[in-house]
Amino acid sequence: MATVFRPLERLRVPRPSLHPGVTGSGSACCRCTLGAKRYLLTDNIVKLKEFQHKKIAIAYNLPGTKEIYFRNLEEKLTQNKLILKEELKTLLYLCQSLEDVQLAKAVIYRYHAENKNFTLGEYKFGPVFMRLCYELDLEDSAVELVRDKHLQGFFLDSTSFNILMDMLFTKGKYERALQVLIEMKNQDVRFSKETYILAFAICYKLNTLESLKICTTLREEALIKGDIICRRAYCFVVALALNKNQLKNAVSIFSQIVNPESIVCINLNILIHIQSNMLESLLKILEDSLDTNLSKFVRRHTFSEEVLAKVREKLKDSPALIARFDEVYGKLHVNGQITVHSLDALLCHVPRDKRSNLLLLKKRAVSHRTLQPLSRSLLTE
């Protein structure tokens, strides 16, 4: 390709704009009313509950006390003795405070210095440490370690960086989250599907032309690498492009979304029509969503009250069009096709993890009543 890409590490970390266009009120995801504690990663990635359950189990089965265990490790450090893998693993699960984490950091440095040349196939401590920091709200400690040159190679997996970026995103620390993303790229850690979601969400929250350029760079590099960018990630870029009045860019990205039938895509499409001045087509979309021939089991399109307010504002100078809109709006309201959630809240809401249902199905192989194996036909039903 003839296009020259700017390396991501050379891009300046942009300061977030205080007046995003799409979100209206500019409400942050941590004020989202959808009831989720995290707003980007699903439970099967963060695994916080699983981590906490394991902490309880390890503490219960520990021979002796936590204080004795910690004292033995401190002696090993002062006597320059070898740190074993199981010792570090147990230590991470026993930590309950910032003081405990300080000891864990010292042990991590020693362990990595002793084992950095033997990382292939080794146990990944990075995600465990990040879950510990997530639980204790110690994002500063996590950022310090991932950016420390002496620990290069310790955080080799995308999950560690993803959990840290999610932690920073949830707390509204978007600039620091972008710095972690840049560090991840500089360390040549392979991006996962979740990484692209986080990266584009961070750029969307920064809400600057510079952050939009970062999205463009990442999309082009993903194309070269053959990485797949999911619909949810693309939606953040479309919203950002619309915020910055980059309509052509927004339309181009939206056209790449496969099956744009989600509630977020439906509302982004309405905003694209508003900025394109395609008012007749816009009203046709709203009217078609009222199709009375649809089965009650088919999910109808749902529109954000915030987005519909923008439609009304756009149509206010045309009495004929505003009359049509008011009629459609009333019917949408009666049908329950209007949500009070803003587009920002819808973008940041974590979709339900489908894999958890599959795991339950796999686990349920024996009848609770007869204690006999369930038949294949029953499982398929």
UniProtKB/Swiss-Prot annotation:
UniProt KW keywords: Mitochondrion, mRNA processing, Phosphoprotein
Cellular compartment(s): Mitochondrion
One annotated Gene Ontology cellular component of this protein: mitochondrion
PPR repeats mapped onto the chain: 159-193
Gene Ontology biological process terms, A to Z: heart development; kidney development; liver development; mitochondrion organization; mRNA processing; muscle cell development; regulation of gene expression; regulation of mRNA processing
PROSITE patterns registered for this protein in UniProt: PPR (PS51375)
Pfam family, any one: MRP-S27
Modified residues annotated as Phosphoserine in this record: S375
InterPro entries, per database record: mS27/PTCD2 (IPR034913), Pentatricopeptide_rpt (IPR002885), PTCD2 (IPR034629), TPR-like_helical_dom_sf (IPR011990)
Superkingdom to which the source organism belongs: Eukaryota
Distribution of this protein across tissues and organs: High expression in heart and liver and low expression in kidney, brain and testis.
Family classification: Belongs to the PTCD2 family.
Role played: Involved in mitochondrial RNA maturation and mitochondrial respiratory chain function.
Name assigned to this protein: Pentatricopeptide repeat-containing protein 2, mitochondrial
